[in-house]
């Protein structure tokens, strides 16, 4: 399949100083998977597989993967980075800037949550973060000058200038989940524009992760679009999906085609509950495929906004054959992890 001499590549793989491998291929190309699988079997070093189409549109997702990979191999907070506001009052902030919402958590020295906020991100990550932080401060009757350290995470993390450090949502979700339940070993996070599964060890460190960011299928955006098509709120969709009678299959892997399939089912006079069940099963199937790829085991925790969708949770639990741990702070998990890292600065 490769038409070039691979002698140099083989020599590189045998280099005793090799620490890790980043394997880059063209997006949606199936041919390279054979070589990747071979290298995965032969090498003991950590490996990260990246797929791109050489455009800048996917730069955010690629940056997240690369940074999370690097964070998994070294201490996230270096001693040289520790720079607290010495005039602060022992208050630590985590800001999770996502595609749909921006979440803020403020912790005190005892790791208690003193303020928490979830607001729509809006058109700009930086402006959305400022609004959410100001609201969190207002609710706790605090000022920015009283804050000791701030860590940002999420896809908009690098656009937020008020943070002392940015850390990927992969690492922050791992920290937040382990803090909430030290027995958790596999984390399922379904957000607005991607879904991810993270494996952690008995110290809470990331050992492996996979992300589905090729398209919106199986994400919160997918469910929002389908709810709009069915003229339902997400809350109604969550409840109605549990009352299904007919087991309908949504076969399309693409969000656009899935919407057309839903419109066709509506025309066939299928009930909304049955259609929603089919959508939930579709999301669960995509999620469980990620779990299989990462080798999910141990106790499972689900985080992100989709964890509030009872139908999706039920479908994932049935397919995995396990009970998912879902915290009251599930949607704030990334911000919580960021705030915990802020305490180390």
Feature map (PLM): residue ranges:
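Glycine-rich phosphate-binding/hydrolytic loop that grips phosphoryl groups
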Residues: 220-223, 314, 327-345
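Conserved phosphate-binding catalytic cores of ATP/NTP-utilizing and phosphoryl-transfer enzymes
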Residues: 83-88, 139, 155-208, 288, ...
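N-terminal glycine/serine-rich phosphate-binding loop of ATP-dependent small-molecule kinases
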Residues: 87-169, 308, 317-318, 322-327
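An N-terminal assembly and electron-transfer interface module characteristic of large anaerobic redox
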Residues: 1-92, 110, 215-223
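Glycine-rich phosphate-binding loops at beta-strand->alpha-helix junctions
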Residues: 155, 295-319, 330-334
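Glycine-rich phosphate-binding loop plus the immediately following alpha-helix
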Residues: 124-125, 202-246, 340
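Adenine-nucleotide phosphate-binding core of ATP-dependent small-molecule kinases
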Residues: 258-291, 331
């Amino acid at each position: 399949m490769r038409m070039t001499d691979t002698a140099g590549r083989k020599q590189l793989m045998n280099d005793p100083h090799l620490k890790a491998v980043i394997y880059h291929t063209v997006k949606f190309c199936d041919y390279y998977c054979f070589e990747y699988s071979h290298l995965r079997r032969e090498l003991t070093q950590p490996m990260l597989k990246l797929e791109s189409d050489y455009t800048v549109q996917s730069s955010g997702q690629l940056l997240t993967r690369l940074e999370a990979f690097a964070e998994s191999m070294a201490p996230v907070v270096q001693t040289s980075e520790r720079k607290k506001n010495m005039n602060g009052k022992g208050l630590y902030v985590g800001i999770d800037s996502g595609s749909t919402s921006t979440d803020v958590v403020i912790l005190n020295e005892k790791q208690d949550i003193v303020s928490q906020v979830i607001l729509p991100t809006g058109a700009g990550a930086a402006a959305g973060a400022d609004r959410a932080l100001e609201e969190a401060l207002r609710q706790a009757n605090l000022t920015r000058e009283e804050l000791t350290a701030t860590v940002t995470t999420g896809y908009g993390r690098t656009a937020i200038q008020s943070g002392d450090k940015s850390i990927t949502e992969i690492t922050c979700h791992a920290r937040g989940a382990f803090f909430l339940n030290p027995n958790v070993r596999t984390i399922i996070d379904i957000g607005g524009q991607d879904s991810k599964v993270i494996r952690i060890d008995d110290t809470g460190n990331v050992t492996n992760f996979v992300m589905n960011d090729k398209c919106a299928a199986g994400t919160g955006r997918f469910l929002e679009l389908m709810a709009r098509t069915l003229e339902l709120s997400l809350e109604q969709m969550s409840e109605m999906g549990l009352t299904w009678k007919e087991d309908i299959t949504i076969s399309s892997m693409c969000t656009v085609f899935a919407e057309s399939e839903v419109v066709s089912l509506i025309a066939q006079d299928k009930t909304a509950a049955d259609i929603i069940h089919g959508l939930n099963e579709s999301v669960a199937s995509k999620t469980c495929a990620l779990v299989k790829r990462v080798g999910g085991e141990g106790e499972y925790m689900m985080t992100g906004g989709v964890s509030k969708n009872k139908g999706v949770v039920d479908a994932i639990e049935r397919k995995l054959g396990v009970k998912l741990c879902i915290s009251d702070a599930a949607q704030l998990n990334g911000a919580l992890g960021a705030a915990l890292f802020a305490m180390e600065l």
